[in-house]
């Protein structure tokens, strides 16, 4: 199951649920954007495999079935720390490997993540060729929480 923090209107959730047939949970804090995601779910082919929750990341209890997490630089470093604490708490209670995907991460995110002892850096995918401008943040950085 994929957990998408700051899911917006649900595009990533719908796409990945359709392409990989995974279940997805989108967490959104803004009630107006959440309403759009719920509206989009009605028309999405993969809507039955997607769930949206109106909640702040730091208060969302991570379900035991979550094994993939996607972040599109959704919130401040302070909130990331709290969300990571929730993820780690879920892993302590129900040991499992979780892969974390950070798209367009800030330097502050990477600096913090490199200091979390439970995280292991897995890979970095350069995405600078997708858009003009050569933005070095156009990348996906992957970490894992080991069982």
Feature names for model-found ranges:
Residues 1-8:
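Conserved class I S-adenosyl-L-methionine
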Residues 23-28:
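Conserved SAM-binding motif I beta-strand of class I
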Residues 17-18:
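Gly/Ala-rich phosphate-binding loop of Rossmann-like dinucleotide-binding domains
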Residues 36-63:
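S-adenosyl-L-methionine
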Residues 32-33:
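Conserved short alpha-helix immediately C-terminal to the canonical SAM/SAH-binding motif I
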Residues 68-79:
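A short SAM/SAH-binding and catalytic strip from SAM-dependent methyltransferases
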Residues 10-14:
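Glycine-rich SAM-binding Motif I of class I
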């Amino acid at each position: 199951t994929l957990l998408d923090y700051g899911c917006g209107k649900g595009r990533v959730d719908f796409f990945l649920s359709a392409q990989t047939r995974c279940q997805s949970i989108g967490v959104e804090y803004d009630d107006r954007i959440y309403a759009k995601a719920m509206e989009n779910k009605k028309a999405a082919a993969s809507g039955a495999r997607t769930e949206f929750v109106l909640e702040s990341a730091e208060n969302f209890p991570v379900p035991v079935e979550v094994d993939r997490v996607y972040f599109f630089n959704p919130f401040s470093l302070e909130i990331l720390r709290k969300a990571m604490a929730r993820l780690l708490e879920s892993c302590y209670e129900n040991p499992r490997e979780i892969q974390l995907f950070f798209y367009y991460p800030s330097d502050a995110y990477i600096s913090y993540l490199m200091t979390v002892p439970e995280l292991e850096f897995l890979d970095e995918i350069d995405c600078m060729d997708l858009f003009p401008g050569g933005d070095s943040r156009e990348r996906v950085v992957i970490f894992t929480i080991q069982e």
